[in-house]
A protein has these predicted regions:
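Chromodomain-type histone methyl-lysine reader module
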Residues: 1-118, 122-129, 134, 471-476
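Mobile genetic element proteins and their domesticated derivatives, centered on retroelements
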Residues: 20, 36, 43, 64, ...
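Structured nucleic-acid-interacting core domains from mobile-element enzymes and related host factors
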Residues: 40, 50-57, 295-321, 386-388
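Conserved pre-motif C helix in the palm subdomain of viral-like polymerases
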Residues: 53-75, 93-134, 142-168, 242-268, ...
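Catalytic palm subdomain of template-directed nucleic-acid polymerases
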Residues: 69-82, 103-107, 137-175, 192-203, ...
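Polymerase palm active-site segment centered on the conserved acidic dipeptide of motif C
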Residues: 123-130, 155-208, 212-215, 220, ...
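C-terminal reverse transcriptase regions that engage the nucleic-acid substrate
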Residues: 180-302, 439, 447-449
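RNase H-like nuclease module associated with reverse transcription
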Residues: 276, 313-314, 350-476
Length: 476
């Protein structure tokens, strides 16, 4: 709690929100949001960034900062109550003036980010326009040098070993940090570099085994697919008996991080079970679906993403949608995937916010979602030194959507479509995007919009770079 010098708790204190709804609607929402706002690298930026550096055969190194937040600067006047362990050593009512940001202080992450940004600017780096967690060397006459930041976890990427040594020395002069050498792990991922093949392998087997042990599934019977093709996951009727909440939400949270980083094969099943995390909305069938995913994870814990490669790395994009496949709401599922070379670096599986009237309409919706991601990916690759030589190609398997975008005419069946969903059509008219047809069998985005059988799931996972890396290990 922040106090005034007189000890009045109401002078500087900002109450902690009790729920997310209160956090974004209360009168204090802007204050605590700004205080806590520290840039963190999105996983899409991380995978794209690592993929390009592997293909260029750059060196990847990382430092380790000690007491990170204490190295920031505090610009506000903040007073603290005397900790209970010191009450006997100081007079009653003693207040302490805080000199440095400490862990638990709302603005500590922001202060550390500002301090680090100032340090990197002094070393000749500037923020990327596409991602505020990516820093680029400002002197274009020198060899490229990139720094990716996630709070206090940094990744250096460059082929200039002399500059790498100088940057490390500059950070050690200004902050308390040690050099960890070549990158081996990052944010819970195990990283294996193959300089000969110019590939980087990302696995999360250690975290998977922790999750399986936590819920007692380390010795469970294996499952070939995470979700059966004829599943019946839907909202339960209101008069049905309620199952106890238990660790349902913990299941979803643990698997969500795995899916975000390396296991895109869990995207669609997780998007289904995550709709029923509210107590009283999930039933036995939803519990069984989560348990099946853990059994599937147990049998595929050795799988990982293989980024990079010596071949020509081209950004490919696929978009797909399944019309009205939600049994309870009749809403549709959309998804996209962006691959660099033979490995996916960005993916999404989501449900439409409202009911869509036709497969053409849901195709337009999915195309707009993919077009938004395409614009950002183009900016990110441009900052990474990869300028597109020709308009990127978006592959879809919806012929009606392709015809509507190419003919550019309005019909009575399509005049109600919201204009904001015609982004893909607008980019095509400007020459910034090409739309191409691909058969459903070759559309890798199917894995993000529907439950697939074992053979199709394995085929699409292989096409997206999710391969068996480690032997299947059962951890006691």
């Amino acid at each position: 709690m922040m106090l005034s010098p007189e000890g009045d708790p109401d002078a500087f204190d900002i109450p902690t929100p009790r729920s997310y709804a209160e956090a974004v609607t209360s009168e204090y929402s802007s204050q605590w949001q700004i205080a806590m706002d520290a840039e963190m690298a999105s996983w899409k930026s991380t995978s794209t960034y690592v993929n390009k550096q592997a293909q260029r055969d750059y060196e990847l190194h990382s430092p380790d900062f000690s007491t990170t937040f204490l190295q920031g600067s505090l610009h506000e006047e903040i007073w603290l109550r005397c900790p209970p362990c010191f009450t006997g050593s100081f007079p009653a009512g003693t207040r302490w003036s805080l000199r440095r940001p400490v862990y638990g202080l709302r603005q500590a992450p922001r202060e550390w980010q500002d301090t680090l940004r100032t340090t990197l600017a002094a070393l000749g780096f500037a923020l990327s326009y596409a991602d505020p967690s990516l820093f680029l060397r400002t002197d274009t006459t020198l060899r490229p040098f990139y720094i990716l930041v996630c709070v206090d976890d940094l990744v250096f990427a460059t082929a200039d070993s002399e500059a790498l040594t100088l940057v490390k020395a500059g950070l050690q002069e200004r902050h308390t940090c040690t050099d960890l050498g070549e990158l081996r792990s990052y944010l819970g991922l195990q990283i294996t570099l193959d300089r000969a093949r110019r590939t980087i392998t990302l696995t999360q087997s250690h975290m998977m085994h922790q999750v399986l042990r936590r819920f007692g599934f380390q010795y469970s019977s294996p499952q070939p697919i995470p979700l059966p093709t004829g599943h019946s996951l839907s909202a339960p009727p209101s008069d049905e008996s309620v199952e106890p909440s238990g660790p349902y939400l913990e299941f979803v949270g643990c698997l969500m991080y795995l899916m975000t980083c390396t296991r895109h094969d869990l995207a669609y099943p997780l998007s289904l079970v995550a709709r029923y995390v509210t107590p009283g909305r999930h039933r036995k069938v939803h519990w069984d679906a989560e348990k099946r995913m853990l059994r599937y994870l147990c049998s595929t814990s050795g799988m990982g993403l293989v980024l990079g490669g010596r071949g020509l790395v081209i950004l490919t994009r696929h978009s797909d949608a399944s019309w009205a496949n939600d049994q309870s709401t009749k809403r549709s599922s959309q998804g996209y995937t962006f691959s660099l070379g033979s490995c996916s670096v960005s993916w999404r599986s989501t449900r439409s916010y409202f009911v869509l009237g036709s497969s053409c309409e849901v195709g337009i919706y999915a195309g707009a979602m993919a077009a938004q991601e395409l614009c950002w990916m183009t900016y990110l690759l441009t900052d990474s030194g990869e300028r597109p030589r020709s308009p990127p190609n978006l592959y879809v398997d919806n012929k009606a959507m392709l015809a509507l975008c190419q003919e550019q005419r309005l019909e009575h069946r399509t005049k109600h479509f919201a204009l904001r969903y015609f982004l893909a059509q607008e980019l095509r008219k400007r020459g910034q995007l090409r739309l191409s047809y691909v058969t459903s069998r070759a559309n890798t985005t199917d894995v993000f919009t529907k439950a697939l059988g074992s053979s199709d799931l394995h085929r699409f996972c292989t096409a997206l770079g999710l391969l068996p890396i480690l032997p299947h290990l059962l951890v006691p």
